Amino acid sequence: MAFTVTPLCRNDEHVFNPFFFQVSSSNSTKLNHRFIADIYHGLVSPTDSYAGRFKFPVRPDGYGIFSPARVLESFVQSNITPSADQFVGSLTPQRAYSIKWGEEYDNSATLTGSTGVTIYSAITTNPTFGYVLNSAHPYENNFALSATVEYNVISATPILLTDWSYLTPKKIRRAEWETIACFRVLSNTIKIQTFDSGSTQVGEFLLQNGYNSGTIRYNLGIGTNNLDFSHNNELTSSTEPILPANVHSYLITMEFNGAERSAGYTYEIDDSCLLYETTRIAWLNQFGSHDFFTFKLIKRESINRKNTEWEQYLPYNYSIGDRGRTNLGVEVKKKISVTTDWLTDAEATFLDKCAQSQEHWLIDSNGNALPLILVDTTPDVGQSILTDRIFNRTFNFEYAFSQNTQRT
């Protein structure tokens, strides 16, 4: 018997985009033929859990086509850790899987004699193996996850799991939390290079805390608050704060045995004075990781309430203070509206991803992530004699939980 499985996909795939396997068999012309796929999954080992058996028919071209994506997507979930300290293993946004293949068909050439008898070929002992990420690629950007043990690869440039382009420096203020994620790590070091306002390098720090060679996905703590500690400065061979007051920018790369293993991401520290208290928002990006942005203009908070009431008629001898209507309970929802400062083109493109995301969080000063629901977003466009590209943007959120109140 000839039984062949041909992957029409890569070893690592986006779970929210269908990816396919083509199956063929010399038995495919037999009566009531069905191909069989047994799916197994786990955080690291794909044999941890059995997801189920799935049967699919032969197509007119003689092949069977099967995608495990819809099955596997129910096992991945987001994992936000804003206050991550260096390497923090984060496995739930990815899943290892394996598929064992087989087939079934009626042994009889006709529906007589052995009607209902089914022949199962042996499930193959050399299963398909791969990983999926809690990610999706848009139609206009059909990038692939790397088929090697590295990071995402676009134009052969290893990148980290963020929608912010490494080609553009990103602004960040002091005392802000931020993480960036990596997948299939070969690097065991986060390299931080710091620079003063004149672009002179003043520090180089190699961070390895939390790294484990058996972990394939990490959240990396790279915000100014995450890096608010002292470490050995490779330039001076002394223990110093990573981001002292004279640091204007810092460059983050992944490194292994002295060799850089990722593109470099530059963060420019914004120490400007502001009129309003800032609001830090995070969201689930297309890589199944999280991106962060600071809204610098006015923040408005409001409350919506819904009453559940009971009404009674007052007796003729009622007393002052007796109620005719009683509020049995109140459902309270808090809303928050935040507005950006004037945006660059890179920031505007970045926030388009925020507007498209289905999960958002408010990051407080302690690194807690409070879940939000994005209601809508409105661009506020300003006009100028020189340009019409001066604009900011307002995002309207609801907290994704009701406030606890007393009940009568």
Regions found by a protein language model. Name each.
Residues 2-3, 8-17, 26, 200-211, ...:
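Extracellular/virion structural assembly segments
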